[in-house]
Amino acid sequence: MEQVPLGKQLKSVSNLFSRHLNQIPLYHEGENLTPMQRMIIVVVHEKSQTQDVFQRDLEKFFSIRRSTVTGVLQLMEKRGLLVREPSTQDGRLKRLCLTDQANALFAIIQQNLQEAEALLCQGLTKEEIAFFSTILAKMEQNIR
């Protein structure tokens, strides 16, 4: 059997994972939240417990371009999910703060992501998951 290129496999799994998340309806003001919006809510919620979160943090965390993050954040601001407030340490920077509406969605989003992650890892041992995570981290470093 011929080996399928790893890049194709990674892209395929990523697409299927996003599609799965899109099939779990989570509406805010009549519009379904995208997987990226959901993950941003989780990351900002969790990281803001211990530190200010800035746009550049999301760029690094998700390995996406500034313009991509800007577009997603602007839409989330428009929809009342987050606001940008001046940083207490550096007034030039704007920290990301979730609104009460986004915080109310956090538990549901967290549950959805945990269920999707469980489905993704179904049939894998803890050792296989740890090994795969190590391999992915190495691949990420290779391509940076």
Language-model segments: residues:
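Charged, amphipathic alpha-helical coiled-coil/dimerization segments
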Residues: 74-133
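N-terminal leader segment of winged-helix/HTH proteins
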Residues: 1-31, 79
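Short, hydrophobic-biased segments on the C-terminal half of alpha helices
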Residues: 55, 73-74
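N-terminal helix-turn-helix DNA-binding core of bacterial DNA-binding proteins
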Residues: 22-65
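N-terminal positioning helix adjacent to the helix-turn-helix/winged-helix DNA-binding module
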Residues: 2, 6, 36-40, 54, ...
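Short amphipathic alpha-helical elements of helix-turn-helix/winged-helix folds
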Residues: 16, 43-47, 135, 142
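C-terminal regulatory/oligomerization modules of transcriptional regulators
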Residues: 1, 127-144
